Amino acid sequence: ALETSNGIHFVAIGGDEHGNIHGNFGWVTIEGEAVDITYVADE
């Protein structure tokens, strides 16, 4: 996990039985709105 002083965060979680990597990242916009992205990295 990584979080910067300006509110950007990133988390990657190890692979599942198919080798897929799960994770999420996000930030807060200038307007104060939280943006969160969740992903699965696969082939």
Curated annotation (Swiss-Prot):
Component of the cuticle of the larva of flesh fly. This is Larval cuticle protein SC1. It comes from Sarcophaga bullata. GO terms for molecular function: structural constituent of cuticle. It comes from the Eukaryota. Residues 1-43 form the Chitin-binding type R&R domain. Keywords: Cuticle. It holds the Pfam family Chitin_bind_4.
